[in-house]
Amino acid sequence: MSTIRSFEDLKAKRQEILDRKAARNGKTIINVSLATCSIAAGGKVAMEAMQDEVAKNGLTGVEFMQSSCMTYCYAEPTVEITLPGKDPVVFGGVDENRARELVTEYVMKGEPVEGIIPVNYERVVL
């Protein structure tokens, strides 16, 4: 990350963030926690399974991201999915089978899938 040294740097960073956010409009965002604990619990396997399922079903408009700790240690691996126009939903205990189910049921059909972690806070996303 670059250092912001002036007001112009700050304005440029703001524009970069706004451009990144605008590019995501209309896309499904799948954010997989890949902190050490999640990787140990199978997070990489879950992400690869979801990417495979998206490709297998020919889905477009799906963007994968990876994040560090989501603070749900008891529920690793965790996946946050944001469907266009919807609030993010976090799923826990996502193994390979559940990862595939998340794509076919939640991403493709919008149907709830077991493993939703209730959210009790408001999140600010840049």
Swiss-Prot record:
InterPro entries listed in its UniProt record: Thioredoxin-like_sf
Keywords: NADP, Oxidoreductase
UniProt-listed Enzyme Commission number(s): 1.12.1.3
Organism name: Solidesulfovibrio fructosivorans
Gene: hndB
MF-aspect GO terms: hydrogen dehydrogenase (NADP+) activity
Top EC class, one word: oxidoreductase
Oligomeric form and interacting partners: Heterotetramer composed of HndA, HndB, HndC and HndD subunits. HndA and HndB could form a heterodimeric intermediate in the electron transfer between the active site of hydrogenase subunit HndD and the NADP reduction site of the reducing subunit HndC.
Regulation: Inhibited by oxygen.
Catalysed reaction, written as an equation: H2 + NADP(+) = NADPH + H(+)
pH dependence: Optimum pH is 8.
Protein name per its UniProtKB record: NADP-reducing hydrogenase subunit HndB
Function noted in UniProt: Catalyzes the reduction of NADP in the presence of molecular H2 to yield NADPH.
